[in-house]
Design a protein with these regions (language model features):
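Universal eukaryotic N-terminal targeting presequences
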Residues: 1-2, 330
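Chitinase-like catalytic core of GlcNAc-active glycosidases
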Residues: 2-240, 250-253, 262-286, 290-295
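C-terminal accessory extensions appended to soluble enzyme cores
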Residues: 240, 244, 254-257, 267-330
Length: 330
C-alpha cells in the first residue's frame, strides 16, 4: 500500500523557510534509513482574486525562494515518494472562486492546471475549509481526472467528524454523498483527527468511521505533529498503543498523516524528521508493543455515533506559518 510496504505515511510541508528565511530541508525524510514516507504534500496553493495571482503561501510558485524546495521535491519523486500539492486550507477563497459559473471556473482553474503541469505533481489534495457545493467539488474532481489521467492522485482532507456527520463539517458538501458519486476517483481522505474534530488517542473514532461504511484503506488518520500546530496532539506512548491496536485489527489500515513537518516532535525544528521516524516504527512493527502508562489500566468505551455529545466544536484556528521569514509583510 505505502512506500516500502507500510501503510501510507503522509507528511504535509507548508513552512518551507524559518523566520530568518533559511530553507527547511526535507532531505532527511528521503535519506534517513529509519524513515519511510510514502507521500509529501506541499502546501498551500491559493487561488486569489487575480486569476493570474496564484500563490504558494505568500509568493508565486515560481518565486526564487522556492527553487531549493522544488528541487528537493524532485529528489523525493526520484526516490519513489509521491509529491502532491495542497489546494486551500485555512485561507478562504480558492474554492469559492472554483464554485462559480463555468466561465469563471475556467478562468481560475487554468493557472492551477498550469502549475500542476509545470511542477510535475503526482496529485492534488483538496483541503476544502470553506462552503462549496457538491456539484462544484465534483466538477473540479472530474476536470482534474480528465486533464491529468488515471494515475493522478486526488485526495481530500475533511475533518474526521465530517465522515460521521455531515453537519460537523467545514466543506459545505456531504462527504458520504461525494464518496458515493465519485469515490472511484478519490485515492483517499486525509481525515483531520485533531482541533476538536477528532480523537486519535484511541482507535474508537477511527473504528466508528469504519462502522459508518468507510473503507479503511481510504481513511488516513490525520495527526498534528506537535501541540504547537493545533489541539489534539497525542503523546507518542499513547499514539503508539492506539496505532498498534488499529493495525492489529485492521490489516488494510490506510495510514497516518502529519501536519506539519518543520516543527514536528520529538525533534522540533532542530530534527523535524524524527516524527516520521517514530511513525515508520509504529506502522512497520510486526510484534505487539506493550505500553504502560503510570496508574493506567485498560479502558473499554462504547460510543453511540448518533448520540449528541454537546455543542458542535469550533473550527480550528488558522495556523501562523513562517513561509517568508518576513513576518511584517503578512
Amino acid at each position: 500500500m505505502g512506500h516500502n510496504g507500510v501503510p501510507r505515511l503522509v507528511v504535509y510541508h507548508q513552512t518551507t523557510h524559518d523566520p530568518s528565511g533559511n530553507l527547511i530541508s526535507i532531505l532527511p525524510l528521503i535519506t534517513r534509513p529509519g524513515v519511510s514516507v510514502s507521500h509529501l504534500i506541499i502546501a498551500a496553493i491559493h487561488i486569489n482574486e487575480d486569476p493570474d495571482g496564484l500563490t504558494l503561501n505568500d509568493h508565486p510558485p515560481a518565486h526564487p525562494r522556492f527553487a531549493s524546495t522544488w528541487a528537493e521535491l524532485r529528489v523525493a519523486q526520484a526516490s519513489g515518494i509521491k509529491v502532491l500539492g495542497m489546494l486551500g486550507g485555512a485561507a478562504k477563497g480558492s474554492y469559492t472562486r472554483l464554485d462559480k459559473a463555468e466561465a469563471t471556473f475556467e478562468t481560475y482553474y487554468q493557472p492551477l492546471y498550469a502549475m500542476i503541469k509545470e511542477r510535475g505533481l503526482d496529485g492534488l489534495d483538496l483541503d476544502v475549509e470553506e462552503p462549496m457545493s457538491l456539484a462544484g467539488i465534483i466538477r473540479l474532481i472530474d476536470r482534474l481526472r480528465a486533464d491529468f489521467g488515471p494515475v493522478f492522485l486526488i485526495t481530500l482532507a475533511p475533518v474526521a467528524a465530517a465522515l460521521l456527520d455531515s453537519r460537523r463539517n467545514l466543506s459545505g458538501f456531504d462527504y458520504e454523498a461525494l464518496e458515493v458519486m465519485r469515490g472511484k476517483q478519490i485515492a483517499w481522505y486525509n481525515a483531520q483527527f485533531y482541533c476538536g474534530w477528532g480523537d486519535a488517542s484511541t482507535p474508537v473514532m477511527y473504528q466508528m468511521c469504519l462502522a459508518r461504511g468507510w473503507m479503511p484503506e481510504k481513511v488516513v488518520m490525520g495527526l498534528v505533529t506537535t501541540p504547537a500546530n493545533g489541539a489534539g496532539w497525542v503523546p507518542f506512548e499513547l499514539l503508539g498503543s492506539s496505532l498498534q491496536l488499529i493495525k492489529r485489527s485492521i490489516p488494510n489500515f490506510g495510514g497516518v498523516m502529519g501536519w506539519e513537518y518543520f516543527n514536528s516532535k520529538p525533534g522540533d525544528t532542530a530534527r523535524p524528521w524524527e516524527w516520521a521516524e517514530r511513525m515508520t516504527g509504529f506502522l512497520d512493527r510486526t510484534k505487539q508493543i506493550s505500553v504502560e502508562l503510570p496508574g493506567s489500566k485498560p479502558v473499554q468505551a462504547e460510543l453511540d455515533p448518533d448520540k449528541e455529545e454537546g455543542a458542535e466544536p469550533e473550527a480550528p484556528n488558522a495556523f501562523d506559518y513562517h513561509s517568508d521569514g518576513l513576518e511584517d509583510e503578512q
